[in-house]
């Protein structure tokens, strides 16, 4: 059986935790930041856990994680 290919776009966007969960970046922090509060921008800088309903799709894209 051939090796499974990793989707490189997904590999750059998601990281796996020690417990097997996937971490992702938050949206809304690329531009148009003037009107957003410092607290919001700081919160958007943290990582978020991928929802368990989406984790299955992410794990299919990253077969060796």
Swiss-Prot record:
PROSITE patterns: RIBOSOMAL_L35. Gene3D superfamilies: 4.10.410.60. The keyword Transmembrane helix does not apply. Keywords: Ribonucleoprotein, Ribosomal protein. It comes from the Bacteria. Pfam families: Ribosomal_L35p. GO terms for cellular component: cytosolic large ribosomal subunit. GO terms for molecular function: structural constituent of ribosome. InterPro entries: Ribosomal_bL35, Ribosomal_bL35-like, Ribosomal_bL35_CS, Ribosomal_bL35_sf. The keyword Ribosomal protein applies. SUPFAM superfamilies: L35p-like (SSF143034). GO terms for biological process: translation. Belongs to the bacterial ribosomal protein bL35 family. PANTHER family: 54S RIBOSOMAL PROTEIN BL35M, LARGE RIBOSOMAL SUBUNIT PROTEIN BL35M. HAMAP family: Ribosomal_bL35. NCBIfam families: rpmI_bact. This is Large ribosomal subunit protein bL35.
């Amino acid at each position: 059986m051939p090796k499974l290919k990793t989707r490189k776009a997904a590999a750059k966007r998601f990281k796996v935790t020690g417990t097997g969960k996937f971490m992702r970046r938050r949206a809304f922090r690329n531009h148009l930041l003037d009107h957003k509060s410092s607290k919001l921008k700081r919160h958007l800088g943290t990582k978020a856990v991928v929802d368990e309903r989406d984790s299955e799709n992410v794990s299919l894209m990253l077969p060796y994680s």
